[in-house]
Amino acid sequence: MVKIVLLVVFILILVYFSKYVIYAVFHPKTFFKYVYIDIRDYFKFKKYNRFTNYGVITMFTASGTQVFGSGKTISMIKDVIRIYKQYNNKLVYDPDEQVFKTQHIHIISNVELNGIPYIKFTGVNQFVDIDKYNFDSMDVAIYVLDESGAVFNSRQFKNNISSEMLTRLLQSRKNKCCLFMTSQRLQFTDIILRQICCVVYECSKKWRFVFLKAYNPLDLEYAYNPEIIKPKSTQLYFCDNNLYNSYNTNQLVENLNKKYTPLSNEEVLASYGNYTPSVDNLSSSRLKKSYNRRVRQREK
């Protein structure tokens, strides 16, 4: 019986990795050559120390009607702190100069962070003129923007998403940068930022438990109701006092009130773009079928 179970498991694994298995069978020399090379280089050049998830633009939004206290900011800060503690001051290999260097994680944030160093975010010139900081070639810059919709919907930032900034954002992987943002709703953020966003986390909070659902931004962009979309992944974590005390948003609120003059309603709506949700724009036929099925159920 055990042998049969093991055989079934083995067959399922082969089916799941069928494309890779087929390539390995027909190209064994090339396949196993690079398996050996990559495993060797992983340890030889300490690749486990490198932070390689730069180039990712991540948005945290509220779930359902829980616009406030949904865990958006604390989820963003949790990820940033994890990255800093895991990868800062780690020895990594620079393939261009062929030497080992110390990797530094530089955080540029409009949220006051406690316990880790950061550069205060004052304007989008910090995206365009990042070279002025003289970061090393193996250093990583992480931008942290809480309430990004409120920040970019101000007159001071009216023309901020310029071609230079857009170029920087699109080339963030080459520049070893990544961007974390929060917004009460995805559509509250400028349409340009929404279009280049990589993943959206919808957050909900009960007591100290925070539940996250990861979505493809394009699915949320064109869906009437996020509930019809199956999330790419889900996760649950618990907030302790250390996490609560790791940041302070009071200064952010004060800065928003003092420094930024809101745009008019017409200007804000223009920055959101022509938001016309349509089931025809959903990214897969599965989503369309799910939507149509729910509509039929409601009509019964």
Question: At which residue positions do the language-model features occur?
Answer:
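Glycine-rich P-loop/Walker A and Walker A-like loops and their local beta1-loop-alpha1 context
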Residues: 57-90
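Conserved nucleotide-sensing/catalytic segment adjacent to the nucleotide-binding pocket
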Residues: 112-171
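Loop/turn-to-beta-strand initiation segments
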Residues: 104, 139-142, 175-181
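Phosphate-binding P-loop
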Residues: 50-59, 87-100
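N-terminal pre-Walker A segment at the start of P-loop NTPase domains
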Residues: 15-54
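Feature marks short, highly hydrophobic, charge-poor N-terminal signal-anchor/signal peptide-like helices
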Residues: 1-8
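Conserved P-loop NTPase motor module
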Residues: 213-300
